[in-house]
Amino acid sequence: MIQFLTLIRFAFSFLLLTAFFCLYRKEYGFMKQFMWKMAMFQSARNLYAYLVVLMLIFINWCCHVTAPNLSVVVSTLLTLVLLNRRIAESTFHLLHERKRLWFATLLLSMVCYALPYMNSMSLFLFTVSVAAVFYPSEKVLSIKSHPEAINNPKELLALIIRNYY
């Protein structure tokens, strides 16, 4: 069991990176539906945030079982802070809107990945950074309230897709 959890822990970053490159700026049917629901429904954004936190809890558990250390405690506490919907939403918006902060978070994630015993912190920062990319921007959330866009949903979807990232 521990070998399997160790494999999950080390493969997680690469799987997340693969998913990122396969889905980023792609106009697949399910990605259009994902972008539409994330832009239009608060419940979809809440579900997305909770699924990210659930994924972080699982990864922290894997890190705790395979290599418990202080970094696991810190990343677990930060994950528990993200259980608050408002904090998670503001974190995703902040990282999505400010590209320099997003890049600094990714850079810090790579530094933590290179340091011994900081793997769980690296996984936390990397997951939050990738999750922030797929969270809708403030511009997209403001587009949905235009009165002329409400009359034509296909044009609204095209506008959302064009401005999502």
Q: For each of these PLM feature ranges, what is it?
A:
Residues 1-8, 57-74, 92-96, 111-127:
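Membrane-helix interface and helix-disruption motif detector
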Residues 5-31:
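N-terminal signal-anchor/start-transfer transmembrane helix
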Residues 9, 13, 97-148:
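Alpha-helical membrane-associated segments of multi-pass integral membrane proteins
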Residues 19-27, 49-64, 78-91:
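Canonical alpha-helical transmembrane segments
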Residues 24-39, 83-101, 141-150:
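Cytoplasmic membrane-interface regions of multi-pass membrane proteins
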Residues 32-68:
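Membrane-helix boundary elements
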Residues 45-51, 98-113, 154-161:
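Small-residue-rich segments of transmembrane alpha-helices in multi-pass membrane proteins
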Residues 140-165:
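Short, highly charged, low-complexity non-transmembrane loops/tails of multi-pass membrane proteins
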